């Protein structure tokens, strides 16, 4: 069995790491590079950086901080934010990122997934999906969630988009469960199970981690390949070394770290 991955998520705005609740009311959490180095030292398996303002503002990610992170850490990291074409993706990878993640731009032009997979290989292409449960009980996709004033509700069902993204060449899916984001009540196991049933590529769970058992649950009950979290790591509520010891005690395979 492949080891499960523990992945701190760093939302970036104006050159700083921020964190909100349900994608709203963001507060400053610290310096990008300092937090990246802290998580590297604690034994994180990889990092994900979301420039949450890039797509709503119609710009690309700032390559300068990508380069600084790449020079100082030796674990894989993924970058998302305003990647609309192969040239921008190439610049992000050239700056030092190991993977690129696309979300809103792919919803506007799904063929972008195939273009990136053809250019760099599926192993470099992550598709992030911001999903929320509607009143009719269906999970549907949101776009431009980094800016509450520009967020768009789309008619597309989350499960349909997962299937389409895979068909087009996504090498990994990150499911951001918006209803659970930042509230620390646990991952959305029901939704993740449905996505897992049709997801043939690695599935990363995001949104809702509040205690160590939540990580064990998402691995055992939803068979996620990795668990992404932000607030519990930024605040120090869950130290990564302790989390890995806890998971090993429950016979969940995780990579060596502190």
Curated annotation (Swiss-Prot):
Belongs to the HisA/HisF family. Heterodimer of HisH and HisF. It is an enzyme of class 4 (lyase). Pathway: Amino-acid biosynthesis; L-histidine biosynthesis; L-histidine from 5-phospho-alpha-D-ribose 1-diphosphate: step 5/9. It comes from the Bacteria. It is found in: Cytoplasm. Its main location: cytoplasm. NCBIfam families: hisF (TIGR00735). GO terms for cellular component: cytoplasm. The active site is at residues 11, 130. This is Imidazole glycerol phosphate synthase subunit HisF. Keywords: Amino-acid biosynthesis, Cytoplasm, Histidine biosynthesis, Lyase. Its EC number is 4.3.2.10. GO terms for biological process: L-histidine biosynthetic process.
């Amino acid at each position: 069995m492949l080891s499960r991955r523990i992945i701190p998520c760093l939302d970036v705005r104006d050159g700083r790491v921020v964190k909100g609740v349900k994608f709203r009311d963001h507060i400053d959490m610290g310096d990008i590079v300092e937090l990246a180095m802290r998580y590297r030292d604690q034994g994180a398996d990889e990092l994900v950086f979301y420039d949450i303002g890039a797509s709503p503002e119609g710009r690309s990610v700032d390559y300068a901080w990508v380069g600084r992170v790449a020079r100082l850490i030796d674990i894989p990291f993924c970058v998302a934010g305003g990647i609309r074409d192969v040239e921008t993706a190439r610049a992000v990878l050239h700056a030092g990122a190991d993977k690129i993640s696309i979300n809103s731009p792919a919803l506007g032009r799904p063929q972008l997934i195939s273009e990136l997979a053809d250019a760099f290989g599926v192993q470099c292409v992550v598709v992030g999906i911001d999903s929320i449960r509607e009143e009719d009980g269906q999970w549907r996709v949101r776009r431009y969630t980094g800016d509450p004033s520009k967020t768009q509700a789309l008619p597309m069902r989350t499960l349909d988009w997962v299937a389409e993204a895979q068909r087009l060449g996504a090498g990994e899916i990150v499911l951001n469960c918006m209803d659970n984001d930042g509230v620390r009540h646990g991952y959305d196991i029901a939704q993740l199970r449905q996505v897992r049933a049709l997801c043939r590529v690695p599935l990363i769970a995001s949104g809702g981690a509040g205690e160590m058992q939540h990580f064990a649950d998402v691995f055992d009950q939803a068979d996620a390949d990795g668990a992404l979290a932000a607030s519990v790591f930024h605040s120090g509520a869950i130290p990564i070394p302790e989390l890995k010891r806890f998971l090993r005690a429950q016979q969940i395979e995780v990579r060596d770290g502190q």
